[in-house]
Curated annotation (Swiss-Prot):
The keyword Hydrolase applies. The active site is at 174, 249, 370 (nucleophile). The gene is astB. It comes from Yersinia pestis. GO terms for molecular function: N-succinylarginine dihydrolase activity. Homodimer. This is N-succinylarginine dihydrolase. NCBIfam families: arg_catab_astB (TIGR03241), PRK13281.1 (NF009789). It catalyses: N(2)-succinyl-L-arginine + 2 H2O + 2 H(+) = N(2)-succinyl-L-ornithine + 2 NH4(+) + CO2. It is an enzyme of class 3 (hydrolase).
Length: 447
């Protein structure tokens, strides 16, 4: 059976705003309190999805979560009508209101870790919801994600859904943003590469300025849940020094597709040993690693972070070459653009660039790779996916019109307490669940 890497992009939610909630994510803190444009943000994401679908790539859509999360506020002691809860939290805990209104679920690379059936002992695709323990505004996503994913991948014969790991410091898990797969054809076994920032039960190198969000113990637990072969699994520590420069997830400093790993030279601790280990394991699959290492002398870590050069999508083309999807910021930076221009003019695997304006997401710290969850599927598994979430020209028009109808074109912090915004969001999401045939996946629908 043929295999595909299918990208499931998150739709930006109606409460997209700049709150500076993500310590360690420098774009998030830099743009705190700016006025956002949720309508533009959603359209920028949709345009990227459509462009890639038009190129022939399999493209799916994942819906935003309900925000503000009134149910979370009630668990924290706020009571009364929904309007009273909003008024009370806005008056007495405004930062909390911002956190429970975050549209961060748009970054579906953090929704879950996914292992293809070719790598799992039971021959099924495994999903483990990420607990996102390190940040409150993200940790509250896990409960709804655990309902949404089975509504999309809703065939028990092909898909296995695991709950998030216990939400404790020892098991901090950030999902696919710290996970890569290296091999040949998508429907053949490959090497799964889990990247962690620290060890929870043993001493070792750790960052000093910013938190390491992913633990080795969490990555190991996910690998066990997914029934992966230890001979085809590697656990790699990210360089603590780059975490302290704003590389809060590995997808800010590395990206892979098939046998190609594109990364900064400072991305990993003990990089030479890491590459040797991967090469050895890939040789067992009769595959050869193509390692594209970007020197610090050509692109600094600071420039990589500010432009999200590595938070790109690396896509395989029919001619065997690779396409790199990058944000506008990468083109705007002279040193990054110089490097990329030389890269695609050479004889390496990457021979094409596609530039997208994703500034609304970028200002909150999420580039092209953040916005998508990669799911490797064979033909039978693709047919088992909820077909209504797969992007078609007709669905693009429907979603674009849906955004025009429901989204505001500017949002400030004071707007989060507006009860009309809550109702606008619920009305929009209720309609979206019908468009995507998801059923009652949101708390307001189930209560």
């Amino acid at each position: 059976m043929a295999g595909y890497e299918v990208n499931f992009d998150g739709l930006v939610g109606l409460t997209h705003h700049y709150a500076g909630l993500s310590f360690g994510n420098e774009a998030s803190t830099t743009h705190q309190n700016r006025t956002s444009n949720p309508r533009l943000a959603a359209k920028q994401g949709l345009l990227k999805m459509k462009a890639l679908a038009d190129l022939g790539y399999k493209q799916g859509v994942l819906p935003p979560q309900e925000r503000p999360a009134i149910g979370v506020l009630r668990k924290l002691g706020f009571s009364g009508s929904d309007e009273q809860v909003l008024s009370d939290v806005a008056r007495n805990a405004p930062r909390l209101l911002s956190a429970v209104s975050s549209a961060s679920s748009m970054w579906t690379a953090n929704a879950a870790t996914v292992s293809p059936s070719a790598d799992s002992a039971d021959g099924r695709v495994h999903f483990t919801v990420a607990n996102l323990h390190n940040k409150f505004h993200r940790a509250i996503e896990a409960e709804t994600t655990a309902v949404l994913l089975p509504a999309v991948f809703n065939n028990h014969r092909h898909f296995v859904h695991h709950d998030a790991l216990p939400s404790v410091t020892l098991l901090g898990d950030e999902g696919a943003a710290n996970h890569n797969r290296l091999g040949g054809e998508y429907d053949s076994p490959a090497i799964q590469m889990f990247v962690y920032g620290r060890q929870g039960m043993e001493s070792g190198a750790v960052p000093g300025r910013y938190p390491a969000r992913q633990t080795r113990e969490a990555s190991q637990a996910v690998a066990r849940l997914h029934q992966l072969d230890p001979k085809r699994t590697v656990f790699v520590q990210q360089n603590p020094a780059v975490i302290d420069q704003g590389v809060f997830h590995n997808d800010v400093i590395a990206v892979s597709n098939r046998n190609v790993l594109f990364h900064h030279e400072l991305a990993f601790l003990s990089s030479t040993q890491v590459m040797d280990d991967i090469r050895c394991k890939m040789a067992g699959l009769e595959q050869q690693l193509v390692n594209i290492e970007v020197p610090e002398a050509e692109v600094s870590v600071a420039d990589a972070v500010s432009t999200y050069l590595f938070n790109s999508q690396l896509l395989h083309k029919a001619n065997g070459k690779m396409l790199l999807v990058i944000p506008q910021e990468s083109q705007d930076n002279p040193s990054v653009w110089r490097y990329l221009s030389e890269l695609v003019s050479g004889d390496g695997p990457i021979d094409e660039l596609r530039v997208f304006d994703l500034r609304e997401s970028m200002r909150n710290g999420g580039g092209p790779a953040c916005l998508r969850l990669r799911v490797v599927l064979n033909d039978a598994e693709l047919q088992a996916v909820n077909s209504r979430v797969m992007l078609t020209p007709a669905l693009f028009v429907t979603l674009n019109n849906w955004v025009d109808q429901h989204y505001r074109d500017h949002l400030q912090f004071k707007d989060l307490a507006d009860p009309h915004l809550l109702q606008e969001g619920r009305q929009a999401l209720d309609e979206l669940t019908r468009i995507l045939n998801l059923g009652p996946v949101y708390p307001f629908q189930r209560n």
